[in-house]
Amino acid sequence: MSDLASQRVLTRTSPHLPLGWYFDPGVDEAERKFLFEHGPGYVGHAQMAPEPGDYRVLDWRSNGGWALVNNGGRHDLVSNVCRHRQAIILKDHGKLAGGTITCPLHRWSYSSEGKHLGAPEFPDHPCLDLPRQELQKWNGMLFNGKRDVARDLAKLGVASELDFEGYLLNKVETVEYAFNWKTFIEVYLEDYHVGPFHPGLGKFVTCDDLRWEMGNWYSVQTVGVHNALGKPGSDVYKMWHEQVLRYRNGEPPPHGAIWLTYYPNVMVEWYPHVLVISTLHPRGPEKCVNVIEFYYPEEIALFEPEFVEAQQKAYHETAREDEEICVRMTEGRRALLLDGREEHGPYQSPMEDGMVHFHEFIRREIGQHV
């Protein structure tokens, strides 16, 4: 049993969340107000705008209403909505022309920090600056929330493994799901299904040496390498095994995976020579959007396209399997709810200890508000 399990008999105590909490708009509203508005508020990574003058529009936040801007020694979150006629200014990502943010509609211009510079044909300067937010930074990850991120993660034992120094952003993907965001986190936080449901991942990692690390606002799973990557469990993972071993000259990696969850919705994943950040954004009680960022060491990002392709294909294979689990759980919970039944099973320790920790976190933070 893990340290968490030793504090309780997991099969006898039940911090499980009521089934209605996965479907109730009132609970969804409470989560937004008391969890997300008081959470770390992950914005993006510094590598999204790596050089001074670079910007990236965060399409998944407020319909592209904010842009991440590199202002030399720091990154800022600057409003991307013109103060004149409320038009979106910047698109996609790139470098600010002349170092200024200029709306294409009427040529209103702003500094890279949002200060209003010019309004053509106006006799008096309106002085309408773009709102700007300063950001916290941890391992290159940028936050605008109310948590003290450095304090929350000060004792994180795997911080050095999640160091993005020398890594480049490869791509950002968004995926929409038709289930509650908590269901996704639950599946991410339990290893009990890895063997039975993930033929590829289950032969890449082994949960036999699963180690947990837990803090008030996070948990970490570290799992080992399965059979020195000698027996791939799927054709897709076979390519990923081959690329990892080729790049490492036949030497297995030190870990199979490290999975950090920074509550409520930020996940950082370590795989051999890969770092992935994914962030869940609720869109109501039965919808959520996952924003996935892939980062690789510069050498791999620039010169190893086969490595990148194999890793992402393996990642997506596992993601599709996880989605099926989430859909099945959602269908089952809805069936019970419609039938007026409240049923919950036991937690398996240590493989579902993270789910216990998450359920206790949710109850602690919003229980009094729902």
What are these regions (language model features)?
Residues H38-V43, P50-E51, K115-E121, W259-P264:
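Short Pro/Gly-enriched beta-strand edge/turn motifs at strand-loop
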Residues V69, S79-N80, E134-Q136, M141-F143, ...:
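C-terminal catalytic domain of Rieske-type non-heme iron oxygenases
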Residues F23, R74, A314:
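Conserved acidic
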Residues M48-R147, A154:
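Rieske [2Fe-2S] iron-sulfur-binding domain
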Residues L19, F23-D24, E37-H38, H45, ...:
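Generic structural "secondary-structure junction" signal
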Residues M1, A5-L19, E165-Y167:
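Short, contiguous pre-domain boundary segments
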Residues F36-P40, A87, H193:
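Generic structural signal for secondary-structure transition and capping sites
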Residues W21-R61, A67:
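Non-catalytic accessory segments flanking enzyme active sites
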